[in-house]
UniProtKB/Swiss-Prot annotation:
<comment type="function">
    <text>Antimicrobial peptide. Has activity against the Gram-positive bacterium S.aureus (MIC=6 uM) and the Gram-negative bacterium E.coli (MIC=3 uM). Lacks hemolytic activity against human erythrocytes.</text>
</comment>
<dbReference type="GO" id="GO:0050830">
    <property type="term" value="P:defense response to Gram-positive bacterium"/>
</dbReference>
<dbReference type="Pfam" id="PF03032">
    <property type="entry name" value="FSAP_sig_propep"/>
</dbReference>
<feature type="signal peptide">
    <location>
        <begin position="1"/>
        <end position="22"/>
    </location>
</feature>
<dbReference type="InterPro" id="IPR004275">
    <property type="entry name" value="Frog_antimicrobial_propeptide"/>
</dbReference>
<feature type="region of interest" description="Disordered">
    <location>
        <begin position="26"/>
        <end position="65"/>
    </location>
</feature>
<keyword id="KW-0044">Antibiotic</keyword>
<keyword id="KW-0929">Antimicrobial</keyword>
<keyword id="KW-0732">Signal</keyword>
<dbReference type="GO" id="GO:0005576">
    <property type="term" value="C:extracellular region"/>
</dbReference>
<dbReference type="GO" id="GO:0050829">
    <property type="term" value="P:defense response to Gram-negative bacterium"/>
</dbReference>
<feature type="compositionally biased region" description="Basic residues">
    <location>
        <begin position="50"/>
        <end position="65"/>
    </location>
</feature>
<keyword id="KW-0964">Secreted</keyword>
<feature type="compositionally biased region" description="Acidic residues">
    <location>
        <begin position="26"/>
        <end position="43"/>
    </location>
</feature>
<protein>
    <recommendedName>
        <fullName>Dybowskin-2CDYa</fullName>
    </recommendedName>
</protein>
<keyword id="KW-0878">Amphibian defense peptide</keyword>
<comment type="similarity">
    <text>Belongs to the frog skin active peptide (FSAP) family. Brevinin subfamily.</text>
</comment>
Amino acid sequence: MFTLKKSLLLLFFIGVIKLSLCEEERNADDDERRDDPDEMDVEVENRSAVGRHGRRFGLRKHRKH
């Protein structure tokens, strides 16, 4: 029983570390993408598409009047 708990705990920590490293890499990729002017244009186009159709698909919050 102890070895099973030990193994599961080890797997949990390895998974947490892997997720943390993946998140850091993803954030670095996002920062890199923001620095590229072509990628910024695509990002702005995607945002404007969400802005136009976001409320219809539930992607944008409704404004309170």
